[in-house]
UniProtKB/Swiss-Prot annotation:
Keywords: 4Fe-4S, Cytoplasm, Iron, Iron-sulfur, Metal-binding, S-adenosyl-L-methionine, Transferase. [4Fe-4S] cluster 2 binds at C184, C188, C191. This is Ribosomal protein uS12 methylthiotransferase RimO. GO terms for molecular function: 4 iron, 4 sulfur cluster binding; aspartic acid methylthiotransferase activity; metal ion binding; protein methylthiotransferase activity. Its cofactor is [4Fe-4S] cluster. Belongs to the methylthiotransferase family. RimO subfamily. Disulfide bonds: none annotated. Residues 1-34 are annotated as: Disordered. Gene3D superfamilies: Methylthiotransferase, N-terminal domain (3.40.50.12160), Nucleic acid-binding proteins (2.40.50.140), tm_1862 like domain (3.80.30.20). It comes from the Bacteria. InterPro entries: Elp3/MiaA/NifB-like_rSAM, Methylthiotransferase, Methylthiotransferase_CS, Methylthiotransferase_N, Methylthiotransferase_N_sf, NA-bd_OB-fold, Ribosomal_uS12_MeSTrfase_RimO, rSAM. Binds 2 [4Fe-4S] clusters. One cluster is coordinated with 3 cysteines and an exchangeable S-adenosyl-L-methionine.
Length: 479
């Protein structure tokens, strides 16, 4: 389990492993030195990067209001648990985390994706003594609950107890997630995100770019743009014109990327649907203004399965679009996620997916066996796939993609690539190229890192590869 420890003297947390579940709130607990009883908050953050950003915002407000965020249940006057409710296993993990916090501390405020609808009722019935239950992005409600149980310090002076301009971050200093919108307009049958987070609500473009600017000024080298549907950014406000640095900027994906490309950091796009207007962003990648990297949730390739999922079912056109993008930007890296064993998926449907995968030649791929989610419309579909068939198809899928990945990485051997360093152990460093997002993609492990620092870039000669990762040697600076 990973514990993120917040040090107020730094702009971001230091990550270390914890071997004591009873000592530290899990699984992503945030800790800070504390000097005063009666004003201490424990924090447990679960779920995806979008939930992580929610946690960062709550933690920032806690610090602004003068609270200390502490590393142990025993030291906390109250514990906030930010839950995940995307799939049933995540819900169980959230319930377990709430249960542990109740057992170890007893004073618990619950928020996040499980804090809405039927799931909220389950929490209240399972743990009737929780102090408060609120849904995702309910920042004011969470702070109100904290204030109600532990009033802020009367003597707190925000001019003395400084919070970094970029706020509290749970990621290492050199990269950060930038959430550009909340909610989703899609109604996929396997997903309950719209039920939890509502329809798409885009953040004002000035707020998005202002946050990015503060992050870069604080030392962030890589910005990971996230949302439920990045390519739909601004559609809810009809691409309204906002302002940044005194100039007009449309609330739209293209203009956002153009502006982010001016900041001098790596800009990585996640959760991009392959709409036609994404074509306009590819030239920015070819020109080096943003990273030539797209994370696209294809989910499947069979027209029938996609129809059952209520997803776009024109994979032939998608292949044409991918070919067009690669022609415009040969360095383009594509990552995606897929679901196998969706209700009604036949062997023929699965073979269509494997054939499509071979033709698409994606660089990075994740795959999940379909898992029922309470409240999802897919639960009512006929012909659910047996667990053993889902597992067998998952293994065949991963074997197919593993071969594609290995072949693509082998082609990089002998080339020199820029690597951003994530960790260093003596002379050995681990980092990522532009082709790899943190935590979900591959890494580059290279020697010759003595004297280097985490967050720096290093030119690395690639000397080896396996199915997912690269190895290399740092290229000495000739100057």
């Amino acid at each position: 389990m990973t514990v993120n420890t917040f040090d107020p003297s730094k702009a971001s947390p230091v990550t270390h492993a914890s071997d004591s579940a009873s000592k530290t709130p899990e699984p992503n607990a945030v800790a800070a030195p504390s000097s005063e009883l009666g004003n201490r908050v424990g924090f447990v953050s679960l779920g995806c990067p979008k939930a992580l950003v929610d946690s960062e915002r709550i933690l920032t407000q806690l610090k602004l209001d003068g609270y200390d965020v502490v590393p142990s249940y025993n030291d906390a006057d109250v514990v906030v648990v930010n839950t995940c409710g995307f799939i049933d296993s995540a819900k169980q993990e959230s319930l377990d985390a709430i249960g542990e916090a109740m057992k170890e501390n007893g004073k618990v405020i619950v928020t996040g994706c499980m804090g809405k609808g039927n799931d909220a009722q389950v929490i209240k019935e399972t743990y009737p003594n929780v102090l408060s239950v609120t849904g995702p992005a309910a920042y004011e409600e969470v702070m109100g609950a904290v204030h109600g149980y532990i009033p802020p310090k009367k003597e707190h002076n925000p001019l003395i107890d400084l919070v970094p301009p970029q706020g509290v971050k749970l990621t290492p200093r050199h990269y950060a997630y930038l959430k550009i919108s909340e909610g989703c307009n899609h109604r996929c049958t396997f997903c309950i995100i719209p039920d939890m987070r509502g329809d798409l609500v885009s953040r004002p473009i000035g707020d998005v770019l202002g946050e990015a600017e503060r992050l870069v000024a604080a030392g962030t080298k890589e910005i990971l743009v996230i949302s439920q549907d990045t390519s739909a950014y601004g559609v809810d406000v009809k691409y309204r014109t906002g302002f940044w640095q005194g100039r007009p900027v449309k609330t739209r994906m293209l203009e956002m990327c153009e502006a982010l490309g001016e900041l001098g950091a790596w800009v990585r796009l996640h959760y991009v649907y392959p709409y036609p207007h994404v074509d306009n962003v590819i030239p920015l990648m070819a020109e080096g203004k943003i990273l030539p990297y797209l994370d696209i949730p294809f989910q499947h390739a069979s027209p029938q399965v996609l129809k059952n999922m209520r997803r776009p079912a024109h994979q032939e056109k998608t292949l044409e679009r991918l070919a067009k993008w690669r022609e415009m930007c040969p360095e383009l890296v594509l990552r995606s996620t897929f679901v196998v064993g969706f209700p009604g998926e036949t062997e023929q449907d699965f073979q269509i997916l494997l054939d499509w995968l071979q033709e698409a030649q994606l660089d990075r791929v994740g795959c999940f066996e379909y898992s029922p989610v309470e409240g999802a419309k897919a639960n009512a579909l006929p012909n659910h796939v047996p667990d053993e068939v889902k597992r067998e198809r998952w293994e065949r899928f991963m074997e197919t993609q593993q071969a594609i990945s290995a072949a693509k990485l082998k082609q990089k051997v002998g080339y020199e690539m820029d690597v951003i360093i994530d960790s260093i152990d003596g002379d050995i460093a681990t980092g990522r190229t532009y082709a790899d997002a943190p935590e979900i993609d591959g890494v580059v492990t290279f020697s010759g890192a003595a004297g280097m620092k985490v967050g720096e870039f290093s030119a690395v000669e690639i000397t080896g590869s396996d199915d997912y990762d690269l190895t290399g040697i740092a290229v000495e600076d000739e100057q």
